């Protein structure tokens, strides 16, 4: 498996035609907007909800497709078709980068698998981050926008410091279904499977904690987890 994680910073030097013209984070004019595109499995759908929540907590506002200042593509490496769709989507978002100065990031399993190679393969991508680094997205954005660097964050969190995301009962109110995470990763390194390499080592959540989260969701009307 080799090295488990990577965190590097490289100088941002896109071609002149794609050089972004963007305001720094925290600018007092119009709020920054974002768009999250999801490819792959249900876990990615859940991760994209976390991505959106992380950006909104940092002051970003969801935008219509093609109108965002920040585009995050959440990827899947299990299914080849999902990876092909991601690469095709990146080509379409290049126009948005030229016309709006959009910041483009790639997260998820392809990001974890490719790491800095993705920056070389797609030179107009500004940042790459793995599944363990979703909570760090606002700080990644600051580095990209303020320091004008391209960023790769794919280091694994230690199992002792990993905190499982909890669904917020208030944002879940009125939903029929909701995701509850019980574990992540896998310790079985099978020759045909990339999960240990893209999702990390197995970390399980305490059973009482899972029951408590399900009970809190049931109180606000969720009926399926």
List PLM regions with ranges.
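Proteins enriched for Cys/Gly/acidic motifs involved in redox and nucleic-acid/cofactor modification
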Residues: 1-225
